[in-house]
Amino acid sequence: MTLKAEAGIVLVDPRDHHAVRNIDNVLTLYQMMINENKAEEGTAKFLTRDYIQHNPLIADGSASLGKYFAGVKSAHPNAQVVVHRIVAVGDYVFAHVNFVNLLTDDPNDKGVAGVDIYKMNTDGKAIEHWDALQLVGNSQNSAPWVAPDIPRANSNGMF
């Protein structure tokens, strides 16, 4: 099954060929960069060289992101991304994702929920990126980033 088939909700105006292409490019970027362990190849293909990165852990530039995820896959070979929702409007692509085994090799890892925002150029390459990341909890510890043993207030789940 391809990542495109796994994307639960895809919102895009099918008449907006640039937005459709931008979604395809971001989905393929995720697939190559994380799931196929081709981070440097994927970032070279789908990001501009002077790509602006707003995540403070990663330097600007497509090469920096490629090296970062190559390092992640080297440390955690089972790291994967699952795209749950993806939306394209104009030059922007918004993706709601789960990065599993990004930080650990635990087979029971619940992952890191993320919302990625990409600004794309007219050629369909990402020129800028923002993200918000949050550890995914479980029924016994719904907010591991706050404190241990905080019970869930609802059963909705993150995705």
Regions found by a protein language model. Give the residues of each.
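C-terminal and inter-domain tail/linker signature
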Residues: 1-159
